[in-house]
């Protein structure tokens, strides 16, 4: 108790000495020519933190009903602006995109130097960010690169179908999310390193379990509200231990990638080495020779690979699992999708990337999953690099900007019956998710749009098609299971709280 009293007194003293003058100044800014966006009145010290209960995106959406689609909040010492409409998202991400092109960096990322070289956190006008962005766009996610790796994706889809068929033949229930995670991880590691890290059958494999735990924990802890972000004066103490936890999981992923790099560097020195058609060789070529790019350091390559691993395996697998949840909960939608796939594929078992444009109901289903279960409900928080006027309000420099995409997906003024899963809403509509239709921006928009969108989109369509075309499904647990299927856990990616367990039946 004595320690708690001392800590509380120290906290109050620090606030009045360091924070109160800034807080008072920001309050005085409300007035002609410098009015901040409307928002709930903040309390001393904590600001609006106590008004945020439960998942942040849901709390923000509720407050926006009162204060509007451009809302200001005081989260401790942090000034934040929450955007909750396509019109305001257009202002922030497109019309004034340069002013909001930097990421808001959480304290927990300030470890292992990740904040300095990650493509997710580097300033958008930095040489490093432009270099990494260009390499990813031209060497990994370009149309030509995706065409060259189509065979790898088809092989991973065949392995997925074979794995599910094994459960079907044995009449066993399977963890669908675990299978989709393994598929995406297998694809990512094949693309990066020409290896198969995971094994569908080895559910107790140390590599399988540890790798998935590192990735899932990393994305989970990033989404945890952190007192070190609200009150940076306490950041050195890491009071919730979030930086320490992320450091452990991030460090393990970095160590694994470093071992891959060191092994490849040794192999490349041998006179008998045969070049591999993977991304690591491409990055090392650039590091050693330039090839028209600025040189990449080994540190940049290491962190770049970790960024790809986390984004490529976790969010895509989670979105595929959500798609299967909704299709199993809506047998009529599943029947429509299966009929379209049967008509187009015939006796073929797999969809190719070039087939997607010819399957309108499959496309509509994936769009509706993006709307109904956005992987990143707040997208990637931005930071204002300069003071900017938006819709008559002042957005101060260094303000944290959060685009509440989840709120837009539940807005009845945008979507009819927003709480219903209806792929049909997209049929015959010219709405895509590539960053120009701001009512549907699961990958973001502008300079910070997710560079892996082309690959993620192809795999999502193809995995869902593989699972639905080749198998019927029975959900485990009956009515009780159905009630729990939509429960989620907030984080960098919106994960299912309970895994989807279902029995596949060979068609």
From Swiss-Prot:
GO terms for cellular component: membrane. Its EC number is 1.14.14.61, 1.14.14.-. It is found in: Membrane. It catalyses: 11-hydroxyferruginol + 3 reduced [NADPH--hemoprotein reductase] + 3 O2 = carnosate + 3 oxidized [NADPH--hemoprotein reductase] + 4 H2O + 4 H(+); miltiradiene + 2 reduced [NADPH--hemoprotein reductase] + 2 O2 = miltiradien-20-al + 2 oxidized [NADPH--hemoprotein reductase] + 3 H2O + 2 H(+); ferruginol + 3 reduced [NADPH--hemoprotein reductase] + 3 O2 = pisiferate + 3 oxidized [NADPH--hemoprotein reductase] + 4 H2O + 4 H(+). Expressed in glandular trichomes of young leaves. InterPro entries: Cyt_P450, Cyt_P450_CS, Cyt_P450_E_grp-I, Cyt_P450_sf. It is a single-pass membrane protein. Heme binds at residue 450. It comes from the Eukaryota. It is an enzyme of class 1 (oxidoreductase). Its cofactor is heme. Gene3D superfamilies: Cytochrome P450. The chain crosses the membrane at residues 6-23. GO terms for biological process: terpenoid biosynthetic process. Pfam families: p450 (PF00067). GO terms for molecular function: heme binding; iron ion binding; oxidoreductase activity, acting on paired donors, with incorporation or reduction of molecular oxygen, reduced flavin or flavoprotein as one donor, and incorporation of one atom of oxygen. Monooxygenase involved in the biosynthesis of carnosate, a potent antioxidant labdane-related diterpene natural product. Catalyzes the oxidation of 11-hydroxyferruginol to produce carnosate. Mediates the conversion of miltiradien into miltiradien-20-al. Also involved in the production of pisiferic acid and derivative products from ferruginol. Belongs to the cytochrome P450 family. This is Carnosic acid synthase. It comes from Rosmarinus officinalis. The gene is CYP76AK7.
């Amino acid at each position: 108790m004595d320690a708690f009293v001392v800590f509380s007194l120290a906290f109050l003293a620090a606030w009045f000495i360091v924070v109160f003058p800034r807080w008072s100044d920001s309050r005085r800014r409300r007035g002609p020519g410098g009015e901040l966006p409307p928002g709930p009145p903040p309390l001393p010290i904590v600001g609006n933190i106590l008004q945020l209960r439960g998942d942040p995106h849901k709390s923000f959406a509720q407050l926006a009903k009162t204060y509007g689609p451009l809302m200001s909040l005081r989260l401790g010492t942090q000034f934040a602006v929450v955007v909750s409409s396509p019109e305001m998202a257009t202002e922030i991400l497109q019309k004034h995109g340069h002013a909001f092109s930097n990421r808001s960096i959480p304290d927990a990322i300030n470890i292992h130097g990740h904040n300095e070289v990650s493509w997710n956190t580097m300033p958008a006008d930095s040489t490093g960010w432009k270099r990494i962005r260009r390499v990813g766009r031209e060497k990994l996610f370009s149309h030509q690169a995706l065409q060259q790796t189509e065979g790898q994706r088809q092989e991973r889809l065949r392995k997925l179908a074979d794995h599910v068929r094994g459960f079907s033949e044995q009449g066993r229930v399977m963890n669908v999310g675990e299978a989709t995670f393994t598929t995406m991880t297998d694809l990512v590691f094949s693309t990066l390193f020409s290896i198969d890290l995971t094994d569908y059958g080895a559910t107790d494999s140390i590599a399988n379990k540890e790798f998935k735990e590192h990735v899932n924990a990393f994305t989970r802890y990033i989404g945890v509200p952190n007192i070190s972000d609200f009150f940076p004066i306490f950041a050195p103490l890491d009071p919730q231990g979030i930086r320490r936890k992320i450091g452990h999981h991030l460090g393990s992923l970095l160590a694994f990638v470093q071992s891959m790099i060191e092994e490849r560097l040794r192999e490349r020195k041998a006179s008998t080495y045969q070049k591999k058609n993977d991304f690591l060789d491409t990055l090392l070529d650039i590091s050693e020779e330039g090839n028209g790019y600025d040189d990449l350091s080994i540190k940049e390559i290491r962190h770049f690979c970790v960024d790809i691993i986390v984004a490529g395996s976790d969010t895509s697998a989670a979105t595929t699992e959500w798609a299967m949840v909704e299709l199993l909960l809506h047998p009529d939608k599943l029947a429509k999708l299966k009929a379209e796939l049967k008509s187009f594929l015939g006796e073929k078992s797999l969809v190719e990337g070039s087939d997607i444009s010819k399957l309108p109901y499959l496309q509509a289903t994936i769009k509706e999953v993006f709307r109904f279960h956005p992987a990143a409900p707040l997208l990637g928080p931005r930071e204002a690099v300069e003071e900017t006027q938006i819709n008559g309000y002042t957005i101060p420099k260094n303000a944290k900007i959060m685009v509440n995409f989840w709120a837009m997906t539940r807005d009845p003024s945008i979507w009819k019956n927003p709480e219903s899963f209806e792929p049909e809403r997209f049929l015959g509509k010219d709405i895509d998710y590539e960053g120009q239709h701001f009512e549907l921006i699961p990958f973001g928009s502008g300079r910070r749009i997710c560079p892996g969108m082309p690959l993620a989109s192809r795999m999502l369509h193809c995995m869902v098609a593989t699972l639905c075309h080749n198998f019927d499904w029975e959900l485990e647990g009956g009515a009780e299971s159905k009630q729990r299927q939509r429960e989620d856990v907030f984080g960098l990616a919106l994960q299912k709280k309970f895994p989807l367990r279902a029995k596949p039946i060979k068609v």
